[in-house]
UniProtKB/Swiss-Prot annotation:
Induction comment from the UniProt entry of this chain: Down-regulated by TGFB1.
Gene field: TIMP2
Domain NTR intervals: 27-152
Organism (species): Homo sapiens
Record PTM: The activity of TIMP2 is dependent on the presence of disulfide bonds.
SS bond partners: C27-C98, C29-C127, C39-C152, C154-C201, C159-C164, C172-C193
Family: Belongs to the protease inhibitor I35 (TIMP) family.
Subcellular location: Secreted
Residue ranges, annotated region (Involved in metalloproteinase-binding): 27-30, 95-96
Entry keyword set: Disulfide bond, Metal-binding, Metalloenzyme inhibitor, Metalloprotease inhibitor, Protease inhibitor, Secreted, Signal, Zinc
Stored CDD domains: NTR_TIMP (cd03585)
Protein name, per record: Metalloproteinase inhibitor 2
MF terms (GO), sorted A to Z: metalloendopeptidase inhibitor activity; molecular function inhibitor activity; peptidase inhibitor activity; protease binding; zinc ion binding
Endpoints of the signal sequence: 1-26
Amino acid sequence: MGAAARTLRLALGLLLLATLLRPADACSCSPVHPQQAFCNADVVIRAKAVSEKEVDSGNDIYGNPIKRIQYEIKQIKMFKGPEKDIEFIYTAPSSAVCGVSLDVGGKKEYLIAGKAEGDGKMHITLCDFIVPWDTLSTTQKKSLNHRYQMGCECKITRCPMIPCYISSPDECLWMDWVTEKNINGHQAKFFACIKRSDGSCAWYRGAAPPKQEFLDIEDP
């Protein structure tokens, strides 16, 4: 074997080794409008994290223990979910596998959306909508009570670049990324996509109950 061939084999071997040893990709999530996050979640609550600890949560297919972080919480209000208050929230132990870090001590309030696990428990990931309560707009806070639920039959389509279009009347085009280069823009903060009497969907501004007929954008 010539020197060039040996060099090539060595380079390929090093490349393969680097690939095998490369850390897992970080958690990746598609942006969603707050209304979508509300509609997709089993549970949506306002809460504080009181304490946290690492707990075992069964075993993987190889018999290795699965670790999760358990947050004991104080629920302030439930906007969507079971009749029983949520007492514990579970998440993965690292952000690389979509684990969520909450401030503990009971001082910081959060809006937390996630999946129900039953018996006063829920599970959250970085792909769920979890934000400090005081960062929400007044419209967002009010929409949690009724407005977002009214739009769960509508579809919000994110526009990543111009041109973009809706493909059916029950869609609303989410333009924040194009207009503001920010997914937490004006439509996310102040608008909800609501079904109209003719079955189509349109953006509605504000949190007061809409008229039976309303335009695509209506001031409160």
